[in-house]
């Protein structure tokens, strides 16, 4: 029974911290895995050109969906702080208003994605051969942006509601839906990239609509959906708090576009396909760190709101050690699995397989420091300091990485592209440490 009674107000041991964050970690990993399934089916059943096309437009798709991460993480920090201050009714109203705002914004962005997809595909560097698949896949997937955003929002709010296991269940349900429909639409019906896009969109509906139904009905969680009018101040505060998550998403997408541009210039279509494989695997590995950050953030926000300084120190100290252990473990695992994972995606093409395996063994060193940097950004989001969180995220995912992608190939050739992300993580680690030291007296976590 003790394992089922963890509350935001508790003192967290290593075991309790891991148990509380495990559902969100599993949720993010499973979300990443079922996203990877699209790539596996498209690469193996449709071909490497459609696979490259999907990878080319994916950064744009993720930018739109990233708005949901911004609202979810920033809104959860605000709502959890209100709960810590004992303002239950205001927490309900803020939660409800943010869900309504997500629905409205998602509908607008869905329309924008559908209308602009041909121009976006061409801007991203799609070749004539890739263009039809880019537009077809992109238009279908962005049509479901409203559902994607809702899914991302509820992933965070389930934790603030003290229902992380229910969040995991919803994610698994969405993932199984995507996997089954991918197999049916691509392997059986032979619908190609359209099948992959439809499968993804329908799975996002499962992930976004099921939580909506749950929170609309009487439930045992800390949060309820109530009639609510849009209020500018909490919307701006939530978006400000979560701006680092949006910045990370946008920056990663922009850098992804830069990677693709450099690879098309230096290697060609095979380079984009190899990078796509690295991104799919990175999604899964980094999802562990993101899941921990999402899972622990409401705890940090609650204790910040309650002014429990000793618990903030405890959470930071334990989290830093867990991120270090996770970084070493994932780096070793990535080195060992480089060849098998590359073979799984592109084993049908010997030269592409060799390129991907080589790139993987250079790329994997980035996992050593990624966890700490992701947690540091999320930690400041949880403290309702969106500016510092966004600065860490912006420098890590855009400035340092974009600079490395441009400069390192000049010094190291093509290998410089694969080393770029590790270079960015090293610089981000330094910046994260500086901010933690500078802000220690304000938040009393050291």
Question: What does each model-found stretch correspond to?
Answer:
Residues 38, 75, 116-117, 154, ...:
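Hydrophobic/aromatic residues in alpha-helical transmembrane segments
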Residues 51-111, 148-167, 274-338, 370-392:
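Small-residue-rich hydrophobic transmembrane alpha-helices
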Residues 9-46, 59-74, 78, 82, ...:
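N-terminal transmembrane alpha-helices
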Residues 1-21, 79-146, 188-243, 300-366, ...:
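Short alpha-helical transmembrane segments in multi-pass integral membrane proteins
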Residues 72, 140-159, 170-178, 196-209, ...:
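Short runs within selected transmembrane alpha-helices of multi-pass transporters and secretion channels
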């Amino acid at each position: 029974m003790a394992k089922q009674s963890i509350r935001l107000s508790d003192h967290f041991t290593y075991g309790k911290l891991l148990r509380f964050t495990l559902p969100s970690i599993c949720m993010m990993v499973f979300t990443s895995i079922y996203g990877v399934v699209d790539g596996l089916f498209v690469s193996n059943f449709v071909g490497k050109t459609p696979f490259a096309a999907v990878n080319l437009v994916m950064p744009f798709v993720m930018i739109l969906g990233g708005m949901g991460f911004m609202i979810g993480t920033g809104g959860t920090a605000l709502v959890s702080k209100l709960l810590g201050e004992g303002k239950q009714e205001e927490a309900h109203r803020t939660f409800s208003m943010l869900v309504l705002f997500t629905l409205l914004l998602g509908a607008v962005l869905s329309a924008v994605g559908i209308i602009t997809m041909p121009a976006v595909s061409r801007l991203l560097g799609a070749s004539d051969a890739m263009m039809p698949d880019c537009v077809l896949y992109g238009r279908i997937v962005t049509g479901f942006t409203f559902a994607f955003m809702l899914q991302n929002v509820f992933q965070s709010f389930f934790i603030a509601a003290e229902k992380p296991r229910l969040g995991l269940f919803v994610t698994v349900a969405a993932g199984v839906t995507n996997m089954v429909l991918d197999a049916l639409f691509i392997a059986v019906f032979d619908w190609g990239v359209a099948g992959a896009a439809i499968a993804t969109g329908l799975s996002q509906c499962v992930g976004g609509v099921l939580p909506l139904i749950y929170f609309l009905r009487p439930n045992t969680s800390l949060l309820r959906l109530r009639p609510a009018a849009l209020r500018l101040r909490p919307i701006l505060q939530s978006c400000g708090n979560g701006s680092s998550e949006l910045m990370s998403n946008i920056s990663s997408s922009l850098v992804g576009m830069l990677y693709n541009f450099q690879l098309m210039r230096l290697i060609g279509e095979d380079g984009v396909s190899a990078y796509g494989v690295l991104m799919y695997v990175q999604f899964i590995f980094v999802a562990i760190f993101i899941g921990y950050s999402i899972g622990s953030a409401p705890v940090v926000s609650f204790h910040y709101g309650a002014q429990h300084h000793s618990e903030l120190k405890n959470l930071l100290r334990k989290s830093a050690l867990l991120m270090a252990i996770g970084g070493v473990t994932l780096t070793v695992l990535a080195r060992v699995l480089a060849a098998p994972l590359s073979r799984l995606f592109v084993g049908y093409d010997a030269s592409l397989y060799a390129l991907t395996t080589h790139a993987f063994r250079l790329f994997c060193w980035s996992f050593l420091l990624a966890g700490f940097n992701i947690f540091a950004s999320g930690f400041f989001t949880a403290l309702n300091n969106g500016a510092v969180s966004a600065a860490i995220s912006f420098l890590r995912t855009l400035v340092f990485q974009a600079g490395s992608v441009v400069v390192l190939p000049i010094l190291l050739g093509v290998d410089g592209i694969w080393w770029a992300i590790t270079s960015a993580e090293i610089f981000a680690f330094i910046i994260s440490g500086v901010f933690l030291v500078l802000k220690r007296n304000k938040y009393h976590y050291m």
